[in-house]
């Protein structure tokens, strides 16, 4: 009786874990379909990096402290670069 109960509970636990993993994969695949292609994301990342570093360099040339430009959308300026938060 105990062995059967343990087997049933083990199967139930495996089923729950498998279902959860499948749902996560499905959600990730939907996000990938809706989002931008990787090449466009790379271009956006490079643009943010360039934008942030150039703005800091311009401010340094004017003998002012570098007031880092705020990066938007989960990014912040650090070491003259936009980094993902």
Swiss-Prot record:
Protein family: Belongs to the neurotoxin 12 (Hwtx-2) family. 02 (Hwtx-2) subfamily.
Q: Which GO terms describe its cellular component?
A: extracellular region; host cell postsynaptic membrane
Superkingdom classification of source = Eukaryota
Task: Let me know which tissues express this protein, per UniProt.
Answer: Expressed by the venom gland.
Q: Which GO terms describe its molecular function?
A: toxin activity
User: Chief localization class?
Assistant: secreted
Q: What is this protein called?
A: U4-theraphotoxin-Hhn1a
Report the record's disulfide bonds. 52-66, 56-77, 71-82
Q: Where is the signal peptide?
A: 1-22
* UniProt source species: Cyriopagopus hainanus (Chinese bird spider)
Is DNA repair a UniProt keyword of this protein?
no
Supply the residue numbers of the propeptide(s) excised during maturation.
23-48
Question: Which InterPro entries does this one have?
Answer: Hwtx-2-like (IPR012625)
Subcellular location(s) of the protein: Secreted
- Subunit text: Monomer.
Question: What PROSITE patterns does this protein map onto?
Answer: HWTX_2 (PS60022)
């Amino acid at each position: 009786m105990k062995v059967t109960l343990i087997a049933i509970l083990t199967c139930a636990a495996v089923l729950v874990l498998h279902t959860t993993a499948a749902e996560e994969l499905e959600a990730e695949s939907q996000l990938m379909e809706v989002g931008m292609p990787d090449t466009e994301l790379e271009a956006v990342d490079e643009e943010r990096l360039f934008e942030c570093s150039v703005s800091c360099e311009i401010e340094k040339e004017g003998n002012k402290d570098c007031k880092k430009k705020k990066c938007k959308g989960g990014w912040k300026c650090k070491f003259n670069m936009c980094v993902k938060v």
